[in-house]
């Protein structure tokens, strides 16, 4: 912060928001899903679906007539979250930037499915044994993140049911390979 800056109001959201509010004497706390909805509505007033993929969890918020209709969270597995991608990149001595760079230029992403971390790791090892490139595995992992979100969290069979105004949130979408995978799997083909 600039030296003369003054904090006039503060807010907190996420896991343990009430505890943090009390401990740090924060002015306001908000339930995370409501914060997601409020932010999405600010940027896309006609939002129909919100997909949040963070480092540790995923959320899908379905909206109907401008109100939250349903909220779905990932279960115990974190295979579709940012921390899993980061761990995978580090295991190959890759930075996230290099992971993305390799994934984006892949010509044949490996189909890793959308299973939990333990199964995903074994599929990755199998793909390595079969001679797939780091880029193809990275691209496959990016696709698996989105497949996991669509199939296991959102439980969507037809992506057109997401509506026309989808807002994506969460740090995992800063990964261009994941964002491109999301676009390929959810936008209608012409």
Q: What is the predicted function of each stretch?
A:
Residues 1-32, 164:
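N-terminal glycine/serine-rich phosphate-binding loop of ATP-dependent small-molecule kinases
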Residues 4-5, 44-47, 161-163:
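Short helix-loop-beta connector
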Residues 17-54, 59-66, 70, 154-157:
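Conserved phosphate-binding catalytic cores of ATP/NTP-utilizing and phosphoryl-transfer enzymes
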Residues 65-108:
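Glycine-rich phosphate-binding loop plus the immediately following alpha-helix
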Residues 122-152:
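Adenine-nucleotide phosphate-binding core of ATP-dependent small-molecule kinases
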Residues 153-160, 167, 172:
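Generic long, charged, amphipathic alpha-helical segments
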Residues 183-189:
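Conserved small/polar residues in nucleotide/adenosyl-binding loops
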